[in-house]
């Protein structure tokens, strides 16, 4: 490193003791000394060669600067007397009294000339004060002590806020972190402004006041009282101000009856029946949770979905309850009435890719698992009055909290009723209780015999037999469209649209395959207790009106073949050429003759009874989809053809086959 005159001059000055401090302000204090000779700085050159680091030296009462023996006219740090110019004013000063030194070169001269002197001016280089000097100043001037206490309070608050901000969770969002940092920065600016204003208290320029909504601690209040005592004649915060601020911060805001009612309603929604029954179905803590987008066609934003996370094995009815809970908690618009906060009032439907409701697909089976449908987007729609009545009868749910009604004064309000009306009301209540009473029905599973298995289902008298069949097939992992119900020990097949109250007593039911029913073709009648809900006519009518059978379809020339492309977005190719064949009751998806190396020769045969939906796309008429129920789950097939007309023909043929098989079964 090259040693220049300027570097030697600066280093020589830093190794000197402070002397000749002028009595000016902090920013204008000047330190003067005589410049050393160039030839006498060999020791300084050696010091620079060894790279001496002054920044690592700890400060005590004065900077660690030792005067060089080669430098002349250098005074030790002690009380000095200095005569300022022609005025002859004598000033006493110490090196420790300097808060700042300056670093501005005001005058320069030839370093080699001994007669010339150099004056340096340094600005805002902080030096550490002696603790003894600070205590001495506070003892002589109580005002300084009070101001230092206020600064200490501000610094303590700032330290606490910084420590609390460091404890913020690292996984919080970026916006949350920015808000917390801005809050800390705002509080810091407020405290620094209070600290800066405190320096002007001695001049009476700024009154010391605290906002009325701020919360003062005991230490802060004592500091305000101390400042008021120091400056009694000027406009300051008085004891009454502190006491008033304390009373305002400790007092409770008045609460109106309307606000209390709204808070009670909000707490009721968070702790109501929805939260009690469906909050446990959240899949937020599970890795394999169902992550769905739920659309609300009746809301103000029907195209904006609500993201929910559900457990993997949740049922459709349970998913509806949890979705309603999230709708209420997030306060979406319009709000749902208390009576409608009931899963029986709603249905879950499948939507298109753009979120529009798929009108061709019916409401999802409430007793089945939601995961079997294989979709990630659904729509929550209002059920019809008939569906609400049916769901409420099968699965009663109370959507309201029991409200406390003041009891009437029997002494002043007496209601006379006749014996006839009271008796009729009692009979109606007994009938209602009987219908709502739960029963356990036994369903025998094939194969039948002495070692036959049974499945117990808890139902009510108003439960439809279709719900019983759905629940049995769900519990035993069976395909619902292949089975039906009959009374045990008979060949009478039960219509699934009737209720359990249409049966006499509590008979044992049997689960039977539909093909067995078709072979026997029984039309036996079942005795019932209610003529209105009798199943005689329905069974005989179905047997007489059913002119289709499986042999007619199989014997007819119904084989058709179409060239389609199966769309697979996840695949490397994007789409694969396939042959879609309609043969009897089955739809076959076969590989085409022009196979490539990425395809495997695999044929999928789908029964028409397992096809849930077949629909042509509205946005892309050349595309159509087919949804199939298989092994308690649903699978979706997306196909593409050359023209919209060909897609319409395929969809119409598959739908006709679905209707034919449905009439037979």
UniProtKB/Swiss-Prot annotation:
Post-translation changes: Phosphorylated; under environmental stress. Either Ser-61 or Ser-62 and Ser-298, Ser-299 or Ser-301 are phosphorylated as well.
Entry keyword Nucleotide-binding: no
Domain SIN1-type PH: 558-659
Consequence the record notes for mutating residue 310 to H: Decreased ability to recognize and bind AGC protein kinase family members substrates. Abolished ability of the TORC2 complex to catalyze phosphorylation of gad8
Modified residues (Phosphoserine): 62, 133, 404, 490, 502, 530
Compositionally biased spans, kind Polar residues: 65-83, 100-109, 522-536
Entry coiled-coil feature ranges: none
Superkingdom to which the source organism belongs: Eukaryota
Keyword line: Cell cycle, Meiosis, Phosphoprotein, Stress response
Effect of residue 310 to P: Decreased ability to recognize and bind AGC protein kinase family members substrates
Region spans: Disordered: 65-112, 395-433, 517-537
Residues in CRIM domain copies: 255-392
Domain characteristics, as noted in the entry: The CRIM domain forms a ubiquitin-like fold with a characteristic acidic loop, which recognizes and binds AGC protein kinase family members substrates.
Subunit: The target of rapamycin complex 2 (TORC2) is composed of at least bit61, pop3/wat1, sin1, ste20 and tor1. Interacts with the sty1 MAP kinase.
PANTHER family listed in its UniProt record: TARGET OF RAPAMYCIN COMPLEX 2 SUBUNIT MAPKAP1 (PTHR13335:SF1)
UniProt record similarity statement: Belongs to the SIN1 family.
Identification of the protein by name: Target of rapamycin complex 2 subunit sin1
Naturally occurring in which organism (per UniProt): Schizosaccharomyces pombe (strain 972 / ATCC 24843)
UniProt gene name: sin1
